[in-house]
Amino acid sequence: MPAIEMPTPPAPPAAKAGASGAASPATPPGAADARAHPAVAPLSTKAAPFRLSAFAPSVAAAAALAVHQWVPSQQTTAPTRIYPRILLTVLAAGVVIALTQRLWRRMKPTPRNFPAAFASNALHWGVSSAPVLAAGVMLLCAWDLVTLKLALVPLPYFPGPDTVFQTLINDWASAGLGQPGLFECMISSLILLLSGYFVGSLLGIACGVLIGWFPAARYWGVPVMKLVGPVPATALIPMSLMLFRNPTLSAVWLIALAVWFPVTMLTLSGVMNVRASYLDVARTLGAGQAYLVFRVAIPAALPNIFVGLFMGLGASFLTMVVAEGVGVQAGLGWYIDWARAYSDYGKVFAALFVMVAYFSTIMTLLFRVRDHVLVWQKGVIKW
């Protein structure tokens, strides 16, 4: 029987020079690795695009300054220099940011290089927010036109921006007549707000966990919430004044009550809607009742809890302003009532400006805490 000859496999073709991963003698070290990983691209040296929109705040400030200086006023008020100086500052800062807008892309700040990081973030914010800043300046210009230049609204009730900004400067330390200034009122409101907010938040989270986890607590707690929760906290001012002889304690109780209901409802909803699979796995691994509550139910309910905290914070702002008008001797709400009683509406608008910045800052801080705690959550509202 003839022997069967097995065909020998053909030899692989010779690798071309430079095609394999091994570096040739003429190839510098690291060149082969760079070819093997083409996704690693060299740093681009192309200059950042120059945005003409960065000049928008400067153009708007120049237009507002021209209107304020050259359009004749229909109202007789004492001229001030605060408003023109603010416009000049915005104009100069806008020009500087617009001319140096390419620097923030070239900067490579590190955590240890705080000045470079701060300058880069400031330039980036100034360029990206230029249209919004320009719109704000144009609103000031329209306000100046409607109040002082065209007199479309009565002056005592709607002062111009120059009067309001002058009041902010003059009343920051003292409001006159021996009354506290805006800074002292802001600190007093902050203490009052945080006291009531923390008490209401802690009670709301505790009640929400108890009612949501234990059926017996749910049986008795839900009817109480249905009766007390929908009642506005400001409607209970007479009752709070009878219960607490101290007006400050009365205001703290009202703020805590306004925060308690939304925090309790959202915490209750979050605890009751925890996935059963989470609890089953924890029980299988030997988890006890305390572990299920504090390590499974509450962490899973954190998104709902933060929604309740945001709703409670908005309710606390309203309740604080109303409660400060009843017996409290300092605070932004008290300052507005005091200025309105003297028909000094420049002080009223100045306090409103402080309230906008004050409440927005507190809300921003709460959003930062939410983003830090719920870092795993995607698609949430950014502030």
What is the predicted function of each stretch?
Residues 96-108, 272, 307, 349-383:
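C-terminal transmembrane helix and the adjacent membrane-cytosol boundary/short C-terminal tail
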Residues 195-225:
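Transmembrane-helix boundary motif in ABC transporter permease subunits
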Residues 220, 262-309, 332, 336:
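Short cytoplasmic-facing helical segments at TM-TM junctions of multi-pass membrane proteins
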Residues 1, 36-122, 130, 253, 257, 290-323, 350, ...:
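Transmembrane alpha-helices
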Residues 225-260, 269-270:
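Generic hydrophobic transmembrane alpha-helix motif, especially the helices
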Residues 71-82, 119-121, 125, 149-198:
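Periplasmic/extracellular loop-to-transmembrane helix junction in inner-membrane transport proteins
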Residues 242, 270-271, 318-358, 374-383:
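Glycine-rich helix-loop "coupling/hinge" segments at transmembrane-helix boundaries
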